[in-house]
């Protein structure tokens, strides 16, 4: 049977959900093919969304019309701001989720969205015509034709689950791997490599002894992810902290020879920032304990996820390890930990629109691109969906810059540098992180969302008013010169503030940590009518004014540099500071400008600086 749509999405995980929903929202006919409809939106690993860097991604996805934020706000069990004591640039919202509620909400959202149809089957191969994808075939002899195809297969491509010496061809425990599609992608000439990730054991909630464990509460004023969320008052459950100990470590050491990670059974590279417990014991042998979080998987608290105990050790060893830990001495394991090895395609095979360079109309998103994490997958799925629709409409792709969004950083890192380990987002990856805060996501991306038809006009108008109010009042504060007069000193004293000794503008005064929103309104009467969202932005902009201005200068400098032309017969060979790889790629593609050079995978900002210098030197000589 042959069926037709505008866009096909393969895979119903976090990337596939965002890709299919956003494309349907933008008015094209979308068909989602997934192995199991009931696992759409399943959180395969930890029961949480957000975190450092990841919270930024979730909020960016939300502003650009994505679903992850709103689903999380409907299914959260505990909400916290991580790094709350640090500056706003590095804070991250994180929520424990009810995995059942999240999955059901996501599935129903997909099933009830106009322009979006779903079928339960397995994609086996791509249909190509003149190096352009035109559809797929499935395991039940269906043929789907479409103008664009987005592949979001997660860990299912030639997936192998490892528990001790046992191996099974699964994409997730108990679910079939996608071997035919994996073979098809290899045959098409993509650069396919292997990665590994893992998950932690789960234990029955009624078998845990919580007495003596440290209770971990949510925030008193819980933060939420979606700007569309109203009247937010979630039920908050506690997590609990426990630790491994020397006995735990000895049990693991005694069984290193049975660990797939060390026996040579696993060849794929695992996530650097989420290592298995056996890897931690091996690499940090001097540590006497490792922190573990017991996290409820649902509101019923029937199962707890042991965060920090990712493992692929044999079943009997997992039993001994868990029973050696305080609070888990009599724990009943409901699901064992396991490692999974899977195919991914080097993301240097992609453009910044997430379209493959080899095959026109084919987009990749999520773990197939070498990333790890629900949020990273959602961000890529969203962008692939948007760009597939724009390509259908013969419009320019939507590319976010590194100075605009963490999504821009994520995609730029992937397509220019590639990866040899599962890539996850951190605030440290963003060189412009002072500009890319969670608190200003709406102001950063609202205009893009509105232009793409993904934000309501009335809301956007209010947002623009707020943005104008921020700019006007910052200008007014800069022009407001304060002197240590009797009146000024008296007012500062009444507010419990230290006196000023010299002239100072309003921005410098508000840079003080102690100057909260209430004091701002009290001292500067023109700030009284402003809403809290505007005041908060003014406060942050004042506090980091010098650094923010510096980052804007750097961006302007970079934008100016990228406009520099590269002479037609410019010789790249022999330039100190350019790697052999960079020289080979520059000679091969012969970019006409530094901007074109920046689009070549493997060309770094440092390479561009060197090129800029030598273009200037050779012009002058």
Swiss-Prot record:
GO terms for molecular function: flavin adenine dinucleotide binding. InterPro entries: FAD/NAD-bd_sf (IPR036188), GIDA_C_N (IPR049312), MnmG (IPR004416), MnmG-rel (IPR002218), MnmG-rel_CS (IPR020595), MnmG_C (IPR026904), MnmG_C_subdom (IPR047001), MnmG_C_subdom_sf (IPR044920). Its cofactor is FAD. Pfam families: GIDA (PF01134), GIDA_C_1st (PF21680), SAM_GIDA_C (PF13932). GO terms for cellular component: cytosol. GO terms for biological process: tRNA methylation; tRNA wobble uridine modification. It is found in: Cytoplasm. NAD(+) binds at residues 270-284. The keyword Transferase does not apply. SUPFAM superfamilies: FAD/NAD(P)-binding domain. Keywords: Cytoplasm, FAD, Flavoprotein, NAD, tRNA processing. The keyword tRNA processing applies. FAD binds at residues 11-16. Belongs to the MnmG family. Homodimer. Heterotetramer of two MnmE and two MnmG subunits. NAD-binding protein involved in the addition of a carboxymethylaminomethyl (cmnm) group at the wobble position (U34) of certain tRNAs, forming tRNA-cmnm(5)s(2)U34. This is tRNA uridine 5-carboxymethylaminomethyl modification enzyme MnmG. The gene is mnmG.
């Amino acid at each position: 049977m042959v069926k037709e749509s505008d866009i096909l999405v393969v895979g119903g995980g976090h990337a596939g959900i965002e890709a299919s929903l956003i494309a349907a929202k933008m008015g094209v006919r979308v068909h989602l093919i997934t192995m199991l409809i009931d696992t759409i939106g399943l959180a395969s690993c930890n029961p949480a969304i957000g975190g450092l860097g990841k919270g930024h991604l979730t909020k960016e996805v939300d502003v650009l019309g994505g679903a992850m934020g709103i689903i999380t706000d409907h299914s959260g069990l505990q909400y916290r701001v991580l790094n709350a004591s640090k500056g706003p640039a590095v804070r991250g919202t994180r929520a424990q989720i009810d995995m059942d509620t999240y999955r059901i909400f996501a599935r129903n959202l997909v099933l009830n969205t106009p322009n979006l149809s779903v079928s339960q089957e397995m994609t086996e191969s791509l249909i190509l015509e003149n190096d352009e994808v035109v559809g797929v075939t499935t395991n039940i002899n269906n043929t789907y034709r479409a103008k664009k195809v987005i592949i979001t297969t997660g860990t299912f491509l030639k997936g192998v689950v490892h528990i001790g010496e046992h191996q099974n061809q699964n994409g997730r425990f108990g679910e079939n791997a996608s071997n035919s599609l994996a073979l098809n992608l290899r045959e098409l000439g993509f650069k396919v490599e292997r990665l590994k990730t893992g998950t932690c054991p789960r234990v029955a909630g009624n078998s845990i002894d919580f007495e003596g464990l440290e209770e971990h509460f949510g925030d008193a004023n819980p933060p939420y992810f979606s700007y569309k969320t109203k009247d937010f008052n979630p039920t908050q459950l506690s997590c609990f902290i426990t630790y491994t100990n020397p006995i735990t470590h000895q049990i693991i050491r005694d069984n290193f020879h049975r660990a797939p990670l060390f026996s040579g059974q696993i060849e794929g590279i695992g996530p650097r920032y989420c290592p298995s417990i056996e890897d931690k014991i091996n690499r940090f042998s001097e540590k006497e304990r490792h922190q573990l979080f017991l996290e409820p998987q649902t509101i019923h608290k029937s199962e707890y996820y042991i965060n920090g105990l990712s493992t692929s050790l044999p079943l009997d060893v997992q039993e001994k390890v868990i029973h050696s830990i305080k609070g888990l001495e009599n724990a009943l394991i409901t699901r064992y930990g396991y490692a999974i090895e899977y195919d991914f395609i080097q993301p240097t095979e992609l453009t910044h629109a997430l379209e493959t360079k080899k095959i026109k109309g084919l987009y990749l998103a999520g773990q197939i691109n070498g990333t790890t994490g629900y949020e990273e997958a959602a961000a890529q799925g969203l962008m692939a969906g948007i760009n597939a629709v724009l390509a259908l409409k013969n419009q320019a792709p939507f590319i976010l810059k590194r100075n605009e969004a963490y999504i821009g950083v994520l995609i730029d890192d992937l397509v220019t540098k590639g990866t040899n380990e599962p890539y996850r987002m951190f605030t440290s990856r963003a060189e412009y992180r002072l500009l890319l805060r969670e608190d200003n996501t709406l102001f950063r991306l609202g205009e893009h969302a509105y232009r793409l038809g993904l934000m309501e006009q009335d809301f956007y108008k209010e947002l623009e008013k707020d943005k104008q109010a921020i700019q006007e009042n910052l200008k007014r504060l800069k022009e407001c010169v304060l002197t240590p007069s009797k009146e000024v000193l008296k007012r500062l004293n009444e507010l419990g503030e230290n006196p000023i000794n010299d002239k100072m503008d309003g921005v410098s005064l508000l840079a003080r940590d102690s100057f909260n929103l209430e004091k701002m309104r009290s001292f500067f009467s023109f700030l009284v009518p402003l809403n809290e969202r505007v005041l908060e932005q003014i406060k942050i902009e004042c506090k980091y004014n010098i650094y923010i201005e510096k980052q804007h200068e750097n961006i302007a400098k970079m934008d100016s540099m990228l406009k520099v032309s590269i002479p037609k017969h410019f010789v790249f060979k022999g330039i100190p500071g350019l790697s052999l790889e960079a020289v080979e790629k520059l000679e091969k593609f012969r970019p006409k400008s530094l901007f074109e050079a920046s689009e070549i995978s493997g060309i770094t900002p440092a390479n561009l600086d060197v090129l800029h210098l030598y273009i200037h030197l050779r012009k002058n000589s």
